[in-house]
Each structure stands twice: as C-alpha cells, then as structure tokens.
Amino acid sequence: MATVNVRDTLVNLTSRLIQINTVNPPGLTSEASSFIKDWLGSLGYSCEIREYVKGKPNVVARVGKGSPTLILNGHMDVVPPGDESRWSYPPFSGKVIGDRIYGRGATDMKGGLAVVMLVFAELAPLVEGAGSGTLVFSATADEEVGGHAGVEALVKDGVLVGDAAIVAEPTGFNRYCIGEKGLCQLRLIARGRPAHGSLPILGENAILKLVKAIEGAQRIVEEFNRNIKLPPDVEEAALNAASIYGQEASRRGLGLSLEDFRRVIGSVSFNPGVIRGGSKVNMVPDHAELELDMRVPPGVDPAGLIEAVKSGLRGLAEVEPIDVSSPNYTPRDSPIVRLIEDGIRRLGAEPKPIIMTGATDGRYLRARGIPTVIYGPGELTLAHAYDEYVTVNDLVNTYNVMLYASSRFFNIPSPG
C-alpha cells in the first residue's frame, strides 16, 4: 500500500462508516459491505461476500498462504440511536469535532472496523512478500443480535479458521479483553388455576407463584455465587473492568463502589428482564412467566447454574433455557495476548487485561480453539450511549498497537 496519512485515513474511514446506517434490527449491511469491498478493491485486494441471511452480507479478504493464520475482525451493525433529539449531532453524521468523531457506532464499533481495515491494508503486502502465513480480514453482520448470521455462520462454514484472532471491540488503547461472561437466559413459567377475581380463594394465582419463584431464584443465585472461584488472571481482569465502571459511576454520582462492580462482574448477575401474566384484571391468572437474564463469569459452568435453579424451583415454576453460551477466555500467556501487551508498552502505557460483561463475536472464535484477544478503540462506557464518540487519538494508538502485534505475529518488522 502506498504511504498514507494514518490519522486522516482513520478519521475519514470512521466518519464514512458511521454515515452508513446499519442499525440492528434490521441490521442490513449491504451498503457497508459494498463500501468496504470497494475500498479494499481500490488497493488491489479482492473480497469474498458471504450472505447467510438476506440483507446481511459479510466481507472476507485474505492474503498469503499457509500457517500461521491471523484473523482481524470487526462488525458492521450498530444498535438503534434512541431518541435522536437527545444527540448533540445527528447520530449518523460522523461529525468530527476536535479530537472526537461522533455518531452511533463510533465506539461500537465503526472506529474499530476502520482500524482493522487499515491494519489489513498496510500489512497485507508484507505478509504476501514473506511467502508464508495468512492474514484474514472479516467485516461481519449481526453481532448486536447474537452474531448468528455473521461470525457464528462464518466459523461453522469453515471460512474463519486460524491460529489467533483480534476482534476490535472497544477497550481503550491501554486495555485489552481476555474473556467474557457467558449468557444464561431462562424462562420461568408459573401455572395456576383461574377463578373470578372477587373470590381468589377458589383459584391459584400464577403471578403470586411467579413472584415466589423469582425470589427463590435470586436466593439460589446468591448461594451459587458464594462458591465461585475465578482463575487468577480472570480475577485480575475483573478488577480492572470494575475500575472502569467504578470511575464512570463516580463521575455520575451513582454512589456505587469499586467493590460493588467487582462483585457483580466476578459473579453470576441476576436481572429479571421481561414479565408477562394474566389476561384480565378481574380474573385469577392461571399463567405467568419471566424472562431472566444472567451472565456467568469465566470458570463457571452455566449447566450447573441451570440445574441449581431447576432443582430449587421444582413444584413452583418450570424452567426453560432461552439462550445459553459458555463463558470464555484466552490465557494471558497466549502469544497474541503477549504481542498486544508489548505493543501497548511500546507506546509508554502499562497494559491492563479486562473481561467483558456482555458477549462479543470472540466467543465463536474461542469455541473453535482460536486464541482471541478483544482490542480496539473507544470506551466501554460510551457504547450504546447518546452522543457516542471515539477519539482520533485512540484510533491512532490502537492502530499502532494492532499493526505492531500483527506484524510480529508473522515475524515481520512492524511497518509502523
């Protein structure tokens, strides 16, 4: 690739990507994928389009041959902007004000996508010239609703196979994510007996049974949490993540401590999210149900948690899994993690591992045995927020770290 102004290129790519509306739902990525394909094509790199769900194409490019293989990944879809009147600038403007680029997805993760695009473009000719090793770029759909038409499908299809991966979700330039909590969403169903509301003793109120089931489930989770022992590197990462949220809570005056966040990040969280029950106010309801969201830290088996809830609520509520995925992490001594750490130190900062409380596409890569590190520009606390932005400085710093780590992965001198 010809010499480029890294700063200007990253700003222009990020702003242009923000301007392409990829809100999910519906998560349509045809325009974004065409833009990415054309941009890489203008540099001489061909792309493959993989579309598993109509309107949600994924872009894949690869150069080189043989091992080792490194995957660079970013997702194209974003969450809805919410009330647009609460934005200082239009959410799809990609407005550049000083060091900040504003817009929905600036942090999560059009900025990260711009970084992996440019890293691929800069490193590709060097990998080709080295004669061995494969560099894979993937811009994927559907992450904000589970990644089923994106990374999950590409992994199942054998398109994304490698020896290591970097997923450019927002971490901030001096932090990197080694793992994430697993998902354990359950449906609790309470059944009763209908009767006229004026004589409730003739019926059995399913809503009241469900209330008892919710309280029981919470006690079960609290007891379950008392027996959790995290791996040492996960414990450190949980504390670092807690520090991020603790600082933000302090800024907002929420009265939450570092220990409050450490406890919830390092244990099973409990959030009754959706409740339904009854059909008419003057009837004793015979059916009520809850959708319960729990997040499980690395080192904990969701199957054991589900069994504990089922056993504890037997006779009170039925328990059905809605969506379950295992927690996952990449050990800190993995080569790709060490390379990211080295890259951060080269910029004069001390690298800090964290874990994510939510899920990323990294879980599908780790499930296939691919050591994966989450590393990209932007602050976690800005993702999905009004006036979401990414700083230009963060874009440039994460680009330099990722370019260094990726080149050293192939034993190529870093061009940066």
Predicted features along the sequence, with ranges:
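Buried hydrophobic positions in well-ordered alpha/beta secondary-structure cores of metabolic enzymes
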Residues: N21, A61, L72-H75, V116, ...
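Active-site metal-coordination/substrate-binding segment of hydrolases
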Residues: S67-V136, Y386, V392, N397
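Midchain, well-structured core segments that form catalytic/ion-binding scaffolds
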Residues: K156-K310
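Phosphate-handling active-site elements
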Residues: I97-D99, V119-V136, V161, A217-I228, ...
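An extended, acidic, His-containing surface patch that forms the Zn2+-binding/catalytic region
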Residues: S42, E48, P81, E223-V274, ...
